[in-house]
Amino acid sequence: MTQGAKKAPVIWVQGEGCTGCSVSLLNAVCPR
């Protein structure tokens, strides 16, 4: 969980350009 939290910010920065990446990350962090 700790490693994922550290990698999350990097993914978020790269995901700013593509909504799909952000959505995928959200689903990975808190799937509904």
UniProtKB/Swiss-Prot annotation:
Disulfide bonds: none annotated. Its main location: periplasm. It is an enzyme of class 1 (oxidoreductase). Its cofactor is [3Fe-4S] cluster; [4Fe-4S] cluster. InterPro entries: NiFe_Hase_small_N_sf. It comes from the Bacteria. Gene3D superfamilies: NADH:ubiquinone oxidoreductase-like, 20kDa subunit (3.40.50.700). Binds 1 [3Fe-4S] cluster. GO terms for molecular function: 3 iron, 4 sulfur cluster binding; 4 iron, 4 sulfur cluster binding; hydrogenase (acceptor) activity; metal ion binding. Keywords: 3Fe-4S, 4Fe-4S, Iron, Iron-sulfur, Metal-binding, Oxidoreductase, Periplasm. It catalyses: H2 + A = AH2. Its EC number is 1.12.99.6. Coiled coil: none annotated. GO terms for cellular component: periplasmic space. It is found in: Periplasm. [4Fe-4S] cluster binds at residues 18, 21. Heterodimer of a large and a small subunit. Belongs to the [NiFe]/[NiFeSe] hydrogenase small subunit family. This is Periplasmic [NiFeSe] hydrogenase small subunit.
